[in-house]
Regions:
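N-terminal beta1-alpha1-beta2 module of alpha/beta enzyme domains
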Residues: 1-67
Length: 70
C-alpha cells in the first residue's frame, strides 16, 4: 500500500495569517518523507475564489527538489 500526504493551503478563518498558514503547510510537506509517506499531493480549489497555492505544479516541483524519493 502506498500512503501519501495532502497539503491543502487553506487558511480561511481560524485567526491565522496567510503567511503562517503557508509556512506551516511547507513544514508539513517537509515532514512527509521522514515520516514514511511516499507522495505529496496538492489541491486545486476549482469551485472557490480562495486559494493560497495557485500553481500546484510549482508547489510539487518545489518538494521534488527538497526530497530524495518523493
Amino acid at each position: 500500500m502506498h500512503v501519501g500526504m495532502g497539503v491543502i493551503f487553506q487558511g480561511e478563518g481560524g485567526g491565522r495569517t496567510d503567511r503562517n498558514v503557508y509556512r506551516n503547510e511547507l513544514r508539513f510537506g517537509d515532514l512527509a518523507e521522514p515520516l514514511g509517506f511516499e507522495s505529496i499531493w496538492g489541491v486545486e480549489h476549482h469551485f472557490t475564489d480562495y486559494t493560497m497555492c495557485p500553481d500546484v505544479l510549482q508547489y510539487l516541483t518545489y518538494f521534488a527538489g527538497r526530497t530524495e524519493r518523493i
